[in-house]
């Protein structure tokens, strides 16, 4: 593989010295970009775009043509695993992801097939290797997966949910069945992320989007436990360097110390946690990623710049910070405002790395 020209992101995740704070955005390849919307129209729909290797590669690279980002993230969806397990993923306009089949019983869990990521999700592996080739060492490529708990919520609810009543019904009423499902999913995620690493991903992130809807004990038992299992099962060295792992639980700031103990190299923070306070709590155990409120991108550019300056100041000097939003960028953001955010990180962060 080509030598990496910009390894700032990987170095920061390992808390090694960098010249400035690296920056990327969750959902950086997305609907806020007119060029993304044009490519998606070519593909027909979101799922076809994920499964079309040249087009998935094209949209992954689009934000890098526009902005001085320090990482690319595979263009895909967290729900590829349940789709490969036969649940029949589809998207309804304005309603988000849906499944034709749902998991509600012990029999449903027992009927789930064992997944082989390299054959069942070969389109993802092809996308990873193609993107890696096209990047030609420009920046590292991030692979990713949903967490077992987050995947389970979609599989049980049949889509997204405000209350998660069906998922919680299974969790509280038949915890042993829920544990079997989560264990099955953890094995699938290990296989999936290791497949991405073998195909060329240089770092991986586990998205625990819905971990924050759980009570503290339930988070430890039904979400963090399985992410810890995944981290334990991942390939941690490839092409002669460490493959860092980032764990991101939305609304998980209260469990930061526990998450920092799961074996990951970095913890993603949403915007509800103060990053200076988070750094004081974890010390130099893990790097931190985040954590500007994505809605700040609606503000005037000068205000965005001020917020970036404030977050940099709160984190303080030294490595171990990857700047990002606290969640994905929203579709109605002006690309120029995203540019102002990235530019501010590039221009203002050097002073913290003297």
Swiss-Prot record:
One of its GO terms (biological process) is protoporphyrinogen IX biosynthetic process from glutamate. GO terms for molecular function: uroporphyrinogen decarboxylase activity. Pathway: Porphyrin-containing compound metabolism; protoporphyrin-IX biosynthesis; coproporphyrinogen-III from 5-aminolevulinate: step 4/4. Keywords: Cytoplasm, Decarboxylase, Lyase, Porphyrin biosynthesis. Its main location: cytoplasm. Pfam families: URO-D (PF01208). It is found in: Cytoplasm. The record marks 77 as: Transition state stabilizer. Signal peptide: none annotated. It catalyses: uroporphyrinogen III + 4 H(+) = coproporphyrinogen III + 4 CO2. PANTHER family: METHYLTETRAHYDROFOLATE:HOMOCYSTEINE METHYLTRANSFERASE RELATED, UROPORPHYRINOGEN DECARBOXYLASE. Homodimer. This is Uroporphyrinogen decarboxylase. It comes from Marinobacter nauticus (strain ATCC 700491 / DSM 11845 / VT8).
């Amino acid at each position: 593989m080509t030598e990496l020209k910009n390894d700032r992101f990987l170095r920061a995740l390992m808390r090694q010295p960098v010249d400035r704070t690296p920056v990327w955005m969750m959902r950086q390849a997305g609907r806020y970009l007119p060029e993304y919307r044009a490519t998606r129209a070519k593909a027909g729909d979101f799922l076809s775009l994920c499964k079309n290797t040249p087009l998935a590669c094209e949209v992954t690279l689009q934000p890098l043509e526009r902005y001085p980002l320090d990482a690319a993230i595979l263009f895909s969806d967290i729900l590829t695993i349940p789709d490969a397990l036969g649940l029949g993923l589809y998207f309804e306009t304005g309603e988000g992801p849906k499944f034709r089949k749902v998991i509600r019983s012990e029999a449903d869990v027992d009927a789930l097939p064992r997944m082989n990521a390299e054959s069942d999700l070969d389109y993802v592996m092809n996308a990873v290797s193609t993107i890696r080739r096209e990047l030609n060492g420009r920046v590292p490529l991030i692979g990713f997966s949903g967490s077992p708990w987050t995947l389970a919520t979609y599989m049980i609810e049949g889509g997204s949910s405000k209350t998660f009543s069906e998922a919680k019904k299974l969790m509280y009423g038949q915890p042993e069945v829920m544990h079997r499902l989560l264990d099955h999913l953890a094995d699938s995620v290990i296989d999936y992320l290791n497949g991405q690493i073998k195909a060329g991903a240089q770092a991986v992130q586990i998205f625990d989007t819905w971990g924050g809807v759980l009570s503290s004990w339930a988070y430890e038992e039904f979400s963090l436990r399985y992410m810890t299992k995944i981290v334990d099962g991942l390939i941690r060295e490839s092409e002669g360097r460490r493959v860092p792992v980032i764990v991101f639980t939305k609304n998980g700031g209260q469990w930061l110390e526990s998450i920092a103990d799961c074996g990951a190299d970095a913890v993603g923070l949403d915007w509800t946690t103060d990053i200076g306070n988070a750094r004081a709590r974890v010390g130099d155990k893990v790097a931190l990623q985040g954590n500007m409120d994505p809605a700040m991108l609606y503000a005037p550019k000068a205000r965005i710049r001020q917020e970036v300056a404030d977050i940099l100041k709160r984190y303080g000097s030294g490595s171990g910070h990857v700047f990002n939003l606290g969640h994905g960028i929203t579709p109605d953001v002006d690309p120029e405002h995203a540019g102002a955010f990235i530019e501010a990180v590039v221009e203002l962060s050097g002073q913290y790395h003297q």
